[in-house]
Amino acid sequence: MVKLQEVRNSLLDEIENIVYRNESKIIKLNTSQIEQHIGFDGNTLENTSSLFKGFYSQNSFTESGGFHRQGELYDFTNSGDFFRGFNVEVLPNLAQIEINSTGTGSGDKASFFRGYYNIFGLTTQNQYILNYEIILPELQRFIKQKIG
């Protein structure tokens, strides 16, 4: 009984550890949504700011040699700072995580990213993957190891 109590008391801390150990997988879930222009709510990523439309206004080449046609949805990969700056944080209540990026910059760049209300976070499908394919198996191993 004491062993079970110890395991129960350590579950939230272990979930936090699991999240941080799998930060790159969680970030990949979010960035893959963005690459498909899908927000956490399942809707298309659209910039709600009147200053920015979220589409390339002219044909342009990227820093990496890629090409964007006028009218294409913005793909967030031009400089790479946005995706490189992604991180995951477990909130103080230990029951929720937050995904964000330090690569949103300041000034116009920050205003541009603020126009996307649904960019950070996981779709229902990716939340399922996080909970049942990433966290649960590791949590089950932890519990099995602790109670023998």
Regions found by a protein language model. Give the residues of each.
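Short, Lys/Arg-rich flexible segments
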Residues: 1-148
